[in-house]
Amino acid sequence: MCPQDVRTGGRHKDFLKKMSLQEFEDNVADCAQHGLRVVNLDGSGEATLNRNLPKYIEIVKKYGAKAFIFSNGYRMEGKFMRDCVDAGLDFYRFSWIGYDVEAYDKWMYNRIGGSFGSTWDKVKAMRQYVIDTNADCVVSTYHLITDNSKIEYELEHYKRIVNELDVKTEIWKMHNWSGVTDISETGVRQGAKKTCGRPFSPDVVIRAGGLDGQRGAVHPCCQVLGRDEEAVLGHTSKNTIEEIWEGEAYSKLRDDHRSGDYPSYCNDCDFLVDDPEVLVWTNHDRDLHHMHGTEFDLQDYRNAN
């Protein structure tokens, strides 16, 4: 469940911003110097709220990277959807928690932004447009098991959705977000705790907004949404990505992950849990620890020392 959910308090005030096109291009250009492969356009909120989203996609393509978006699909329909696909969008994932109307309303808590039925219609229309235009965009869904005692039951319902819509999917166990959300009712994950590998991997998260009027706050991963102020490692409005990566805050985080003395925003996160069955089912060519569109495996970085 997304920490932006009103039940968890959402993002901190200074992070309720949109990154300007120029700032975005400056950050993409900086990252491109270091071998940029994928830009995920959703790290600071619901991407489709940005009415200029196709322009951001065009910038990503200008620098030879893939453009990915994970979203609840709020405005991904009609001309806006077509413009995003035409701009070169490579991968779009609809977050869809809840295997029927009742479960969707409970877990997505998104009656204004969408519903089970409207999300179905958006996925279907986008998939059809990709087929009609022979676009390279992969349309995907993402589902969570809401009760670990009923995995097979929920899995079969999700599979029916995916098969009828003819899309790629990943179905995962429920996870928390750095301790923001209580998921005990779904069945707590069990396993040994170990670094998730993210502080060592070439995965950089740049947020719109920041602390004390600065912008481009860099976070260790996207899972710290909802604990925005605690997890800032630097700002691209002040330093380059390389300077932040090699800076004191990022270096300390890596030391903490080596020693197991995790900061509070990491300590309760399920991504530290070694649970080989967390990815319940997928029809996509995807490994548990392989980040979409990249050439690295997080498992390699979980063994960092």
Model-predicted segments: where are they?
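Conserved alpha-helical substructure of the radical SAM core
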Residues: 1-91, 106-111, 117, 273-305
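Short glycine/proline- and charge-enriched loop/turn segments
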Residues: 5-11, 102, 186-188, 194
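Surface-exposed cleft-lining segments at the edges of enzyme active sites
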Residues: 13, 105-111, 143, 182-190
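Soluble or luminal CAZymes and related metallo-dependent hydrolases
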Residues: 19-23, 52, 114-121, 149-157, ...
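Conserved C-terminal portion of the radical SAM core fold
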Residues: 34-42, 62-70, 85-100, 117-186, ...
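Short, well-ordered alpha-helical microsegments
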Residues: 50, 76-78, 151, 219, ...
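Accessory C-terminal segments flanking Radical SAM cores
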Residues: 154-157, 166-305
